[in-house]
Amino acid sequence: MGFLKGTAAALTLLSAAAAASACGVLYEQCGGIGFDGVTCCSEGLMCMKMGPYYSQCRAMPGMMGQVKPYGQCGGMNYSGKTMCSPGFKCVELNEFFSQCDLANKSPVATPKVSPTSPPGPAQVCGKEYAACGGEMFMGAKCCKFGLVCYETSGKWQSQCRAPPPKMGEVGRYAQCGGMGYMGSTMCVGGYKCMAISEGSMYKQCLPMHP
C-alpha cells in the first residue's frame, strides 16, 4: 500500500512539473483569436497582446532602478545599474560585459538528443512540446527539424523545444523589421523576416516552411 501511495505521489509531482514546463518561452505565441495552445509564459515573462489575433511571451519591463531584460548590468568600467528585473539575473558573458538573463534557464538546458538524427524510419520524430525522453520513456527520442530535445523535469521528462536565439539573432515570431524598427533583422535558423500580411508595416520572424 505504501509503495502505491508513493508511486501516486511521484506521478502527481511529475504531472505538475510537466504542466509547468509547458508554459511558453520567450517570443512564443500565448494567445489570440483562434489560438488553441498554452496561454501561460515561463517565469520572468508576460503574455503581451500584439493584436486581436496574436499575443506573445515577452520579458517583463524593468521597474525604476532595475536593468531591463537582456540589458547590460556589469563589466569592466561599467558604472550603471546592476539590479535586474524580476525573473532575471546578472550573468557574466565575459570580463567586459554582463547581461540580465533569465534566472530560470530550464527551457534552454543542455540538449540531450540530436535534433537531426532520427533513430530510424519506423519512428516519427516529435513536434514542438512532444515528449522525447525521460525515465521509462519508450517513444521516439528525436524531434522534428528545427527543434531540440531538452531535459525539462530532470530525469523524468524531456521535451521537444525550439533552441534559444544566438547573439544578434531575432527569436521566432519576434519583430525583425517595419516602420521605426531599429533592431536586428537576422532571424534564428529556419525562420525568415517577412511582413505579416501584404502591405503591412510590421515584419516578423516566420517559418520558412510553414
UniProtKB/Swiss-Prot annotation:
GO terms for biological process: carbohydrate metabolic process. GO terms for molecular function: cellulose binding. Pfam families: CBM_1. Keywords: Repeat, Signal. Residues 1-22 form the signal peptide. GO terms for cellular component: extracellular region. SMART domains: fCBD. Residues 23-62, 63-105, 125-165, 166-210 form the CBM1 domain. It comes from the Eukaryota. SUPFAM superfamilies: Cellulose-binding domain (SSF57180). This is Putative polysaccharide-binding protein.
